[in-house]
């Protein structure tokens, strides 16, 4: 059956006149389907003991790797656009579009796991012996995605060796080394946030105004707590306010913030965190609308990678349990479970921004000077 969108529905029309004399490639040639569809080599079949589900296992992982390649392609283009002193609104829109594409791809990858789970543990055991020493830990493209996103080497969980040592060929190791040296998406987003208009001390000086608003907000909370007639309830409220004051101190005191960065509990520089908070507060302003979408999509990417890791962990536990080693010699389930921690969450600071919110009515109002600046300035 021919494609209904390609013509009048006939398989062949002898009277049709070609629209061009250029020689093109037919569908299969263009997509190189001869290579793509001939790349499923079932080792169980070569061993004269074919296992039906090995084919599903191969297809699923090859599909993952194809989508990983597209994610890397999108990340590289986004990093190129972000690597500039000024990013105009047109580029910001394109970055948002491509990040959204990555989000949709990751949603597809998350939804792909249940297809693999149609295979039972016994079915998997029938061909698992053929997989060693292969392991998902050896997915070069996934490691490149992590590095290009901004997962730091010191934040990684070690299991037997450095993660890059599992790759034996020099080309793969060079790719890993280059991805570690090149500016990551995290670094480029940080630079971009540091340039957020309105942070200048000689201008709107958002950070000073925000501190004043927080002080007034907490003081109002104290006054309200002091009017509490029940002593125990009053003390509890005052204690809670002091805890909140300490939380705010962690962003207002640069030394405390830097200590949290060194400890791995924060990722952004102090200035970049200020920019992220400002964009969050004023996201309804036209100039900050796209930047806010960009930050939201970065969180979506982090969340979906975590969901994919979690689904992978649960699937591995169902297939091999929690005590066996992985086929590549890793600690299997235990190692995978350890990657679900916040140390693998690249844009952790964006998730924690809600900790520092204040009521809408307490947000410092924008003056006319900064409004005009936002109209005329790209971020």
From Swiss-Prot:
Alphabetical GO biological process terms: compound eye pigmentation; kynurenine metabolic process; L-tryptophan catabolic process; L-tryptophan catabolic process to acetyl-CoA; L-tryptophan catabolic process to kynurenine; ommochrome biosynthetic process; protein homotetramerization
Residues where heme binds: 312
Domain of life: Eukaryota
Cofactor: heme
Coiled-coil intervals: none
A GO term for molecular function: tryptophan 2,3-dioxygenase activity
Pathway where it operates: Amino-acid degradation; L-tryptophan degradation via kynurenine pathway; L-kynurenine from L-tryptophan: step 1/2; Pigment biosynthesis; ommochrome biosynthesis
Pfam families from the UniProt entry: Trp_dioxygenase (PF03301)
UniProt cross-references to HAMAP family, sorted A to Z: T23O
Function: Heme-dependent dioxygenase that catalyzes the oxidative cleavage of the L-tryptophan (L-Trp) pyrrole ring and converts L-tryptophan to N-formyl-L-kynurenine. Catalyzes the oxidative cleavage of the indole moiety. Required during larval growth to control the level of potentially harmful free tryptophan in the hemolymph. In the adult the same reaction is the first step in the ommochrome biosynthetic pathway.
Protein name: Tryptophan 2,3-dioxygenase
Source organism of this protein record: Drosophila melanogaster (Fruit fly)
């Amino acid at each position: 059956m021919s494609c209904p969108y390609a013509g009048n529905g006939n398989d062949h029309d002898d009277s049709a006149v070609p629209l061009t004399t250029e020689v093109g490639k037919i569908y299969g040639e263009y997509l190189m389907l001869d290579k793509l569809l001939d790349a499923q080599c079932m080792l169980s079949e070569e061993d004269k003991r074919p296992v039906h589900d090995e084919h599903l296992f191969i297809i699923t992982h090859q599909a993952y790797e194809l989508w990983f390649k597209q994610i890397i392609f999108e990340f590289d283009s986004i990093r190129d656009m972000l690597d500039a002193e000024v990013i105009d609104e047109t580029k910001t829109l394109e970055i948002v579009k491509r990040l959204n594409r990555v989000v949709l791809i990751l949603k597809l990858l998350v939804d792909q796991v249940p297809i693999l789970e149609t295979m039972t543990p016994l079915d998997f055991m029938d061909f698992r012996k053929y997989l060693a020493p292969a392991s998902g830990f050896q997915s070069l493209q996934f490691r490149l995605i992590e590095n290009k996103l901004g997962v730091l080497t010191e934040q990684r969980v070690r299991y037997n060796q450095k993660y890059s040592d599992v790759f034996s060929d020099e080309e793969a190791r060079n790719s890993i080394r280059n991805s570690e040296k090149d500016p990551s998406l995290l670094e480029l987003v940080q630079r971009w946030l540091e340039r957020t208009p309105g942070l200048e001390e000689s201008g709107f000086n958002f950070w000073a105004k925000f501190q004043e608003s927080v002080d007034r907000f907490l003081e109002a909370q104290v006054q309200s707590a002091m009017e509490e007639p029940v002593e125990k309830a009053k003390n509890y409220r005052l204690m809670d306010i002091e805890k909140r004051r300490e939380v705010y101190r962690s962003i207002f005191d640069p030394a405390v913030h830097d200590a949290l960065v060194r400890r791995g509990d924060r990722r952004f520089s102090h200035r970049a965190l200020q920019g992220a908070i400002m964009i969050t507060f004023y996201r309804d302003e036209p100039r900050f609308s796209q930047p806010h979408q960009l930050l939201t999509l970065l969180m979506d990417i982090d969340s979906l990678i975590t969901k994919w890791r979690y689904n992978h962990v649960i699937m591995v536990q169902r297939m091999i349990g929690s005590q066996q080693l992985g086929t590549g010699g890793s600690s299997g389930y235990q190692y995978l479970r350890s990657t679900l921690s916040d140390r693998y969450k690249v844009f952790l600071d964006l998730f924690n921004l809600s900790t520092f919110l204040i009521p809408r009515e307490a947000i410092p109002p924008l003056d006319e000077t900064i409004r005009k600046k936002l109209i005329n300035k790209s971020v």
